[in-house]
From Swiss-Prot:
InterPro entries per the UniProt record, alphabetical: Anthranilate_Pribosyl_Tfrase (IPR005940), Glycosyl_Trfase_fam3 (IPR000312), Glycosyl_Trfase_fam3_N_dom (IPR017459), Glycosyl_Trfase_fam3_N_dom_sf (IPR036320), Nuc_phospho_transferase (IPR035902)
Biological pathway: Amino-acid biosynthesis; L-tryptophan biosynthesis; L-tryptophan from chorismate: step 2/5
Keywords for the protein's UniProt record, in alphabetical order: Amino-acid biosynthesis, Aromatic amino acid biosynthesis, Glycosyltransferase, Magnesium, Metal-binding, Transferase, Tryptophan biosynthesis
Chain positions recorded as 5-phospho-alpha-D-ribose 1-diphosphate binding sites: 81, 84-85, 89, 91-94, 109-117, 121
Subunit: Homodimer.
Protein name from the UniProt record: Anthranilate phosphoribosyltransferase
Length: 338
């Protein structure tokens, strides 16, 4: 049993926790062995000082050890944003996921309801007719039969219930906003992760390097978007062959036009579902372009495309052939089947 008071005292001096100390502290929180005051103190102490790569790695190790897992092929990918970018945009990573699945890459998408926006991945999928509150085995069947499955975070991370009330009361970003995308219940080794702040691009790539991921892009748009943006450059940290490389990309690198950030303004779940379906049905415009751009990056991560332009061409084929929309229809059917 960890001495939680000693952990708080250490953080209060400005010192960093070791990976093991962080893992044990988060185990205490998620097991219900820490009081709400203790949890709030530690979460805010870490937030104010700035969470380290070792602290995040330790916390993720505990999250992963406690989650309910899903069976998925070794080449499965996840496209996920941390959320919390305050943009109120359409659901980019969700749309991107269907485009990628339509290219024949299995997608095991992890997500939740909106925390800060009007429509998170779970909200828009629910509005599209996908059943989201299904068992881990059922999600595995979706990935196997539909080529895409959605893992609703509360179902797969039941231990989070001990931390939930404290997070709600704090009502500000904590380390948990970073942990969700790093704790995919299907254990995917290939991911496209969007983050709400540029300061986290390289550290999250380092965390995933520590945890043995194979192929990762961590991205942050210059306009604040937790995706690759159309309005300007996007910062990228790429993990490949155990090495991390950082660079910037723009839509022109993919042969796509720029568009202002407000061209991607979204609405509630129903409005965003209508917009997403329109993209899968072939409607041109900025939403299609941003989905193609993010799909192109994901296809590079998956080893399907050698560069962004090839990825965009494959993504366009996925939409225009009807393959992407077929993945959505199949997911609706398989998720509804008992």
């Amino acid at each position: 049993m960890i001495d939680f008071k000693a952990v708080i005292a250490k953080v209060a001096t400005g010192a960093s926790l070791t990976r093991d100390e962080a893992a044990n502290a988060f185990d205490a929180m998620m097991s219900g062995d820490a009081t709400p005051s203790q949890m709030g103190a530690l979460l805010m102490g870490l937030r104010v000082r700035g969470e380290t790569v070792d602290e995040i790695t330790g916390a993720v190790t505990t999250m992963r050890a406690k989650m309910l897992t899903v069976a998925a092929p070794p080449d499965a990918v996840d496209v996920v944003g941390t959320g919390g970018d305050g943009s109120g945009s359409v659901n980019v990573s969700t749309c991107t996921s269907f485009v990628v699945a339509g290219c024949g890459v299995p997608v095991a998408k992890h997500g939740n309801r909106a925390l800060s926006s009007k429509s998170g991945a779970a909200d828009v999928l629910n509005a599209l007719g996908v059943k989201i509150d299904i068992t881990p085995d059922h999600v595995g069947r979706c990935v196997a039969e539909a080529g895409i499955g959605f893992m609703f975070a509360p179902t797969h991370h039941p231990a989070m219930k001990n931390v939930g009330p404290t997070r709600v009361e704090l009502a500000t970003r904590t380390i948990f906003n970073l942990l969700g995308p790093l704790s995919n219940p299907a254990g995917v080794k290939r991911q496209m992760i969007g983050v709400f702040s540029r300061q986290w691009v390289q550290p999250l790539a380092q965390v995933l390097q520590n945890l043995g991921s194979e192929s990762i892009w961590v991205v942050h748009g210059s306009d604040g978007l937790d995706e690759i943006t159309l309005s300007g450059p996007t910062a990228v940290a790429e993990l490949k062959n155990g090495e991390i490389r950082t660079f910037e990309i723009g839509p022109e690198d993919a042969g796509l036009p720029r568009a202002p950030a407000d061209a991607l303004k979204g609405g509630d779940a129903e409005a965003n579902a209508v917009a997403l379906r329109a993209v899968l049905e072939g409607m041109p415009g900025p939403y299609r372009d941003v989905a193609l751009l993010n799909a192109a990056a994901t296809l590079i991560v998956a080893g399907k495309a050698k560069d962004l332009k090839e990825g965009v061409a494959l993504g366009a084929q996925s939409i225009d052939s009807g393959a992407a929309e077929a993945r959505l229809k199949k997911l609706i059917a398989v998720s509804a089947a008992a």
